[in-house]
Amino acid sequence: MTHTEVVCAVVVTHRRRELLATSLDAVVSQDRKPDHLIVVDNDNDPQVRELVTGQPVPSTYLGSRRNLGGAGGFALGMLHALALGADWIWLADDDGRPADTTVLSTLLSCAHTHSLAEVSPMVCNLDDPQRLAFPLRRGLVWRRLTSELRTDSSSSSGDLLPGIASLFNGALFRADTVDAVGVPDLRLFVRGDEVELHRRLVRSGLPFGTCLTASYLHPCGTDEFKPILGGRMHTQYPDDETKRFFTYRNRGYLLSQPGLRKLLPQEWLRFGWYFLVSRRDLAGLREWIRLRRLGRRERFQR
């Protein structure tokens, strides 16, 4: 008897009920519907529970009385999916959505064709889908357009960008892959949790990549990335102080880990240039150093 693969969709939300409704509608409207929907609500909102239980696919609502952040929310949802017997785990958040009804089936087909442990769609700007929602660095070159990713493809079919993926936004994991690389690190809360899991995925040696024929729509996140050196490099500077705290502290931890330490010289160059030359902000550089030191020492108190 042929085993029918079970796909569990995991969506994490926090106080975005209307956006969540739009996201869930796109998730459950796929031509290959997920077999089970799991929604982790970091606000434990009864209205969100009602929304989830009213979906047209079997659904589980996990309301948390403590905000677990994106990292903890996805960790909880992924573990619950494994406990339900999922063969594949499809991740989404509340402010993004699959671009069309074929995304899940396309990802599954790509994963089977290329024997992938994980596959992600391109994450595109919600308002301009020809542009990426987040710039993607390839060596020292930043890619901002979907067409630029397609020119990087090394697969014979032209549908796969191997060895790099945007995690959580439409990412599809084999269950066995989660056994090998684990779930997101709760301590990171928000910011950098996807980079850390990507680091583990790379070090595992498992095959993964970005499917260039599937897209996931997400609000533009490029505003945080400030160009330096005439646009040849970029530095991340969130306008919100809280986001800067988590971004810089967590990067301090990330760049102390195996597989990412090689980026340290470039990190110091980029941020040193940005704070001292672009902003002329010595106090900002000192705060960046303080926050990254907290992360390097694994001081994750909020």
UniProtKB/Swiss-Prot annotation:
The keyword Plastid does not apply. The lineage of its organism: Bacteria, Bacillati, Actinomycetota, Actinomycetes, Mycobacteriales. Its EC number is 2.4.1.287. One of its GO terms (biological process) is cell wall organization. Involved in the biosynthesis of the arabinogalactan (AG) region of the mycolylarabinogalactan-peptidoglycan (mAGP) complex, an essential component of the mycobacterial cell wall. Catalyzes the transfer of the first two galactofuranosyl (Galf) units from UDP-galactofuranose (UDP-Galf) onto the rhamnosyl-GlcNAc-diphospho-decaprenol (Rha-GlcNAc-PP-C50) acceptor, yielding galactofuranosyl-galactofuranosyl-rhamnosyl-GlcNAc-diphospho-decaprenol (Galf-Galf-Rha-GlcNAc-PP-C50). Thus, GlfT1 is the initiator of galactan synthesis, while GlfT2 continues with the subsequent polymerization events. GO terms for molecular function: glycosyltransferase activity; transferase activity. Pfam families: Glycos_transf_2 (PF00535). It is found in: Cell membrane; Secreted, Cell wall. Belongs to the glycosyltransferase 2 family. Its main location: membrane. Keywords: Cell membrane, Cell wall, Cell wall biogenesis/degradation, Glycosyltransferase, Membrane, Secreted, Transferase. It catalyses: alpha-L-rhamnosyl-(1->3)-N-acetyl-alpha-D-glucosaminyl-diphospho-trans,octa-cis-decaprenol + 2 UDP-alpha-D-galactofuranose = beta-D-galactofuranosyl-(1->5)-beta-D-galactofuranosyl-(1->4)-alpha-L-rhamnosyl-(1->3)-N-acetyl-alpha-D-glucosaminyl-diphospho-trans,octa-cis-decaprenol + 2 UDP + 2 H(+). It is an enzyme of class 2 (transferase). This is Galactofuranosyltransferase GlfT1. Pathway: Cell wall biogenesis; cell wall polysaccharide biosynthesis.
